[in-house]
């Protein structure tokens, strides 16, 4: 299709859709002075009636917004607000960790933002997470439904921002978004062949500690626990012999296996499954979380986002949501993608680049599980297992495959990039710029 025809189609799309304009945010409560980066917030309506209103934060690259990659960031959950990514993992701002005193929590600049080299759309999805809302009662959604909604969001967002149509585009996320991101890449790839959609310059995707096939992956928690000296050799050998590798969907008649799995849980239930070296404090109720807990900033972000001056600064629609919840697990949701491995296979066939990384202290999604499904894709190795370095020190290990997929561990990392944001940022910046890790 010629560029002129594409431009004409884009004009027709703009004229046939009512798309709300985003708002430029120059100041945020809690941050001293004007923001040192360009921030836009806004809503994109989804569906014919646009009852679903997806809220986004868009931050331009510090380097060269006109040419740097454009990425969309999706947090996991499902139901976790993208502010978790922006404030805790890869954004230019973070919350100052001090005891809440009733005033607006303070924000500080970070040194590890991925916006150093990329334009990032942080998206609250599914509807009900963060500031995204529905004009009608929220209906049950699903993995496949969200994939289509996010694709529609991107098409409409690019109608509003046609200057980014030519930028290299990547889909990025972690944890549960491991089910969404590969399917979204596949959906975008298909959509690019339809004449009446604005083409998206899709180049690849990035996933951190992704859930890919939970029934398969959770069986790697016991080998991981043994490798980390959390269970004894004797218990591990008995588990292997009696359970035969199936530890979490055990036949009720296999009483011996059930008993052994119970012993495993006695050894590990009081360990922080997202990072084995961090104290296991209760973060389930953020309103009563202890200031000594590593996750105390989760309370601070809820205090910040529930402040009326913050909502006004972000141009949140008044009355659109009640209490802002960082990780909203009450959203009606069906996990209808059992495994995202077939999507990884299709994306590899279509030639898209990918970076899959794992913090090596995560029990929830052990790095061995990720290595196993990558191996099942059956691509040859072109750069074998080796350390990747930062300032002369080993930051992790990496391996690259012939399908343009790079796997990397983050030494000392956990379930998300928040545990080692500096190292994760360097890894991302090297990969996105085409450099070897």
From Swiss-Prot:
Expressed in seedlings, leaves, flowers and siliques. Residues 1-21 form the signal peptide. Keywords: Acyltransferase, Disulfide bond, Glycoprotein, Secreted, Signal, Transferase. Its main location: secreted. Belongs to the peptidase S10 family. One of its GO terms (cellular component) is extracellular region. Glycans are attached at residues 101, 307, 346, 378. GO terms for biological process: proteolysis. Disruption phenotype: Decreased levels of 1,2-disinapoyl-glucose due to a partial redundancy with SCPL8 and SCPL13. Catalyzes the formation of 1,2-bis-O-sinapoyl beta-D-glucoside and an unidentified compound 1. It catalyses: 2 1-O-(trans-sinapoyl)-beta-D-glucose = 1,2-di-O-sinapoyl beta-D-glucose + D-glucose. GO terms for molecular function: serine-type carboxypeptidase activity; sinapoylglucose-sinapoylglucose O-sinapoyltransferase activity. It is an enzyme of class 2 (transferase). It is found in: Secreted. Disulfide bonds join 243-257, 281-293. This is Serine carboxypeptidase-like 9. The active site is at residues 175, 362, 415. Pfam families: Peptidase_S10. Its EC number is 2.3.1.103.
């Amino acid at each position: 299709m010629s560029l002129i025809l594409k431009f004409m189609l884009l004009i027709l799309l703009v004229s046939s859709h009512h798309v709300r304009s985003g708002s430029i945010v120059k100041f945020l409560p809690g941050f001293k002075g004007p923001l040192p980066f360009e921030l836009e917030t806004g809503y994109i309506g989804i569906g014919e009636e646009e009852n679903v209103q997806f809220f986004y934060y868009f931050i331009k690259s510090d380097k060269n917004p006109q040419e740097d990659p454009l990425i969309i960031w999706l947090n996991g959950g499902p139901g976790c607000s993208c502010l978790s990514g922006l404030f805790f993992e890869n954004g230019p701002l973070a919350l100052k960790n001090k005891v809440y005193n009733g005033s607006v929590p303070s924000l500080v600049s970070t040194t590890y933002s991925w916006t150093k080299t990329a334009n990032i759309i942080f998206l609250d999805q599914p509807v009900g997470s963060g500031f995204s809302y529905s004009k009608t009662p929220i209906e049950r959604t699903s993995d496949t439904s969200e994939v289509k909604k996010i694709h529609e969001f991107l098409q409409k967002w690019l109608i509003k921002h046609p200057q980014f149509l030519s930028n290299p585009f990547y889909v990025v996320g972690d944890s549960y978004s491991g089910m969404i991101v590969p399917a979204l890449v596949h959906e975008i790839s298909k959509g690019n062949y339809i004449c009446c959609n604005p083409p998206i310059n899709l180049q690849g995707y990035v996933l951190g500690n992704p859930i890919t096939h939970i029934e398969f992956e959770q069986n790697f928690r016991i080998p991981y626990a043994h490798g980390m000296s959390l269970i004894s050799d004797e218990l591990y050998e008995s588990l292997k012999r009696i359970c035969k590798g199936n530890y979490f969907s055990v036949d009720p008649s296999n009483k011996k296996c059930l008993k052994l799995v119970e012993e495993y849980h006695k050894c590990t239930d009081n360990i922080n499954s997202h990072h084995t070296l961090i104290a296991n404090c209760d973060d389930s109720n953020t309103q009563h979380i202890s200031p000594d807990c590593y996750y105390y900033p989760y309370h601070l972000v809820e205090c910040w986002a529930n402040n009326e001056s913050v909502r006004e600064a972000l141009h949140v629609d008044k009355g659109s949501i009640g209490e802002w919840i960082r990780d909203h697990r009450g959203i009606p949701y069906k996990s209808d993608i059992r495994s995202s491995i077939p999507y990884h296979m299709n994306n590899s066939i279509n030639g898209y680049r990918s970076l899959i990384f794992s913090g090596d202290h995560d029990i929830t999604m052990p790095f061995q599980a990720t290595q196993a499904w990558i191996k099942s894709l059956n691509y040859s190795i072109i750069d074998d297992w080796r350390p990747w370095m930062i300032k002369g020190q080993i930051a992790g290990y990496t391996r690259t495959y012939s399908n343009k997929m790079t796997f990397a561990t983050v030494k000392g990392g956990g379930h998300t990039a928040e545990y080692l944001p500096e190292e994760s940022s360097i890894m991302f910046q090297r990969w996105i710029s085409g450099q070897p890790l």
